[in-house]
Swiss-Prot record:
Pfam families the UniProt entry points to: ThiC-associated, ThiC_Rad_SAM
Protein residues bound to substrate: 239, 268, 297, 333, 353-355, 394-397, 433, 460
Protein name listed in UniProt: Phosphomethylpyrimidine synthase
Enzyme class: lyase
Organism, scientific name: Salmonella enteritidis PT4 (strain P125109)
Cofactor: [4Fe-4S] cluster
Job of this protein: Catalyzes the synthesis of the hydroxymethylpyrimidine phosphate (HMP-P) moiety of thiamine from aminoimidazole ribotide (AIR) in a radical S-adenosyl-L-methionine (SAM)-dependent reaction.
One of the protein's GO biological processes: thiamine diphosphate biosynthetic process
EC number: 4.1.99.17
Residues involved in [4Fe-4S] cluster binding: 581, 584, 589
Domain of life: Bacteria
HAMAP family: ThiC
Length: 631
């Protein structure tokens, strides 16, 4: 852990340098490949890890090798992971989905922004130096049209986004021929449907049933289609965002790019400080992954942070502002009802959700029902016009182990189920947010309750944290719970960084949180028996047994840390071919001994086989040639 503390000026300068020098970068010994679909512009990016051959015999001067197949893996880095792509943050990413959106001919460009706040910001010349220059003209659905992926799916339409996702979810495993790599243990899926091959039709069917969502606002054409659902790979979200006391636009864009490099499937911008609107524009125009927000945070800024002064009109304007910028999903705390707030009074830690506490305070101060609940149908109409997915927030999630699985938590969950059915009336895609702090033996009930109460809509959880005693290590405490609930059926895991409960995460914290949660998600995929999930594990184990150190580094989720730890004790190049590591040394390496045992056993088998043949030869009279009937 670094002890160097940079000043705010130094942090911004460092982030600006990162952006100015940004270029497409591949991981060590990996290359970007594209798998094409039925039409030429469906090109699905993947990372292919190149492996070295295995020494199988021969002499010192004439060694014999066997090639090892390259291993394709899911890649969230977008153009940032392709060395052939020129990156210019000032211009933003290419608009991958624009031709698909235009071809559907069910949306139209707006003459002006619908949000009064957006118009006000655009008219402010003082913001010119902060503003992203290549602003898009926003689009929305034509009158009488539904333009959501859920609507298309229900109409039996397989969109290019769905085909893109089907290819992506298969992770190129059809390229793998080795039986050793393809071997997989049967999983326990807890009722999930996991087909051997994911087809575009399967994607369409899951979306139509509401079991999966494709967050894809028509005003975010730069995003690469992805899916969140129980019957697909477990996804990971990373949170970024400035606050009133720290971080800048440059730093948030840097965190975005960094997040996609380390495996974030979606990113939530939770900014609460100055220039929220401008920061979000820079993030969206440079994001290859879906972007989510909590609109109540910005609405609160518009009323100077006074929760009691919030109004539906201010919130509605914020929804329009963000939808026309391209936000792919909104967290809406519409399940925090007035009658549920007293249930939290006996809790140890009360209401810990920022959005939940804001709405609870508003309800109590006005003694009225939550205006998000009261205006929920209008929220759905807005979302349907841009294809913004809803992430129904758990404003009453438990903030401590003691408060887990209480009446307030599950009362809200049941209300979220009712709201889900309303959203589906408008063809709006929905996922459900979950806890929180839950001990291990109480986690599965959360998944069971969600499936039953929310009609199998995808579950999206923060952890859960399995103990409260480890500030500074809550990426571990929550990673345990995340792996478990992912196995039970949770569709997306919201990462927790080492700074949870302590401060705003920096770039290194983001990486630590993501690596922890990629481990949890992958462990869940293995346990569920997701087809092809074990390929990378098998490739790693084979490389480990064969002392192919470079391949071990490159197959790792974090090749740089794996290499650095190895080189702390064996830095010489000879250490990269040694048949041992510094843990056991050359004489006590279990894998080296296992290889010797295997070689010895093979030699013994040959010797025994030769002895058997010799005895058989003598038993038949010792003749070199036998009559046919004697052979």
């Amino acid at each position: 852990m670094s002890t160097t503390t940079l000043t705010r000026r130094e942090q911004r300068a460092k982030a600006q340098h990162f952006i100015d020098t940004l270029e497409g970068t591949a991981f060590p010994n990996s290359k970007r490949i594209y798998v094409t679909g039925s039409q030429h512009d469906i090109r699905v990016p993947m990372r292919e890890i190149q492996l070295s051959p295995t020494l199988i015999g021969g002499s010192k001067d004439n060694q014999q090798f066997e090639e090892n197949e390259a291993v394709p893996v899911y890649d969230t880095s977008g153009p940032y992971g392709d060395p052939e792509v020129a990156i210019n943050v000032q211009q933003g990413l290419a608009k991958l989905r624009q031709p698909w959106i235009d071809a559907r001919n069910d949306s139209e460009e707006l003459d002006d922004r619908s949000s009064a706040y957006t118009r006000e910001r655009l008219a402010d010349d003082g913001l010119d130096d902060l503003r992203f220059t290549g602003l898009l003209t926003p689009k929305r659905a034509k009158a009488g049209k539904r333009i959501t992926q859920l609507h298309y799916a229900r109409q039996g339409i397989v969109t290019p986004e769905m085909e893109f996702i089907a290819i992506r979810e298969n992770m190129g495993r059809e390229r793998i021929c080795s039986e050793v790599l393809r071997h997989q243990h049967p999983g326990m899926s807890f009722g999930a449907r996991l087909p051997e091959n994911i087809t575009p039709e399967f994607v369409r069917d899951e979306v139509a049933a509401g079991r999966a969502i494709i967050p894809a606002n028509i005003n975010h054409p730069e995003s690469e289609p992805m899916i969140i659902g129980r019957n697909f790979l477990v996804k990971v979200n990373a949170n970024i965002g400035n606050s009133a006391v720290t971080s800048s636009i440059e730093e948030e864009v840097e965190k975005l790019v960094w997040s996609t490099r380390w495996g974030a499937d979606t990113v939530m911008d939770l900014s609460t400080g100055r220039y929220i609107h401008e920061t979000r524009e820079w993030i969206l125009r440079n994001s290859p992954v879906p972007i989510g927000t909590v609109p109540i945070y910005q609405a609160l800024e518009k009323v100077n942070g006074i929760a009691e002064d919030l109004t539906w009109e201010a919130f509605r304007d914020t929804l329009l502002e963000q939808a026309e910028q391209g936000v792919d999903y909104f967290t809406i705390h519409a399940g925090v009802l007035l009658r549920y707030v007293p249930m939290t009074a006996k809790r140890l830690t009360g209401i810990v959700s920022r959005g939940g506490s804001i709405m609870a305070k508003w309800c109590l101060s006005h003694h009225k029902e939550n205006f998000l609940f009261e205006h929920f149908r209008e929220i759905c109409e807005i979302c349907a016009a841009y294809d913004v997915s809803l992430s129904l927030g758990d404003g009453l999630r438990p903030g401590s182990i003691q408060d887990a699985n209480d009446e307030a938590q599950f009362s809200e969950l049941h209300t979220l189920g009712e709201l889900t059915k309303i959203a589906w009336e408008y063809d709006v895609q929905v996922m459900i947010e979950g806890p929180g702090h839950v001990p291990m033996h109480m986690i599965q009930r959360n998944m069971t309750e969600e499936l039953e109460s929310c009609h199998e809509a995808p579950f999206y959880t923060l952890g859960p944290l399995t103990t409260d005693i480890a500030p500074g290590y809550d990426h571990f405490t929550s990673g345990i719970g995340a792996a478990m609930i992912g196995w039970f059926g949770c569709a997306m895991l919201c990462y927790v960084t080492p700074k949870e409960h302590l401060g705003l995460p920096n770039k290194e914290d983001v990486k630590q949180g993501l690596i922890t949660y990629k481990i949890a998600a992958h462990a869940a995929d293995l346990a569920k028996g997701h087809p092809g999930a074990q390929i990378r594990d098998n490739a790693m184990s084979k490389a480990r047994f064969e002392f192919r150190w470079e391949d071990q580094f490159n197959l790792a989720l974090d090749p740089f840390t794996a290499r650095a730890y190895h080189d702390e004790t064996l830095p010489q190049e000879s250490g990269k071919v040694a048949h041992f590591c510094s843990m056991c040394g050359p004489k006590f390496c279990s894998m080296k001994i296992s290889q010797e045992v295997r070689d010895y056993a093979a030699a013994q088998a040959i010797e025994v086989g030769m002895a058997d043949m010799s005895e058989n030869f003598r038993a038949k009279g010792g003749e070199i040639y036998l009559k046919r009937e004697e052979a």
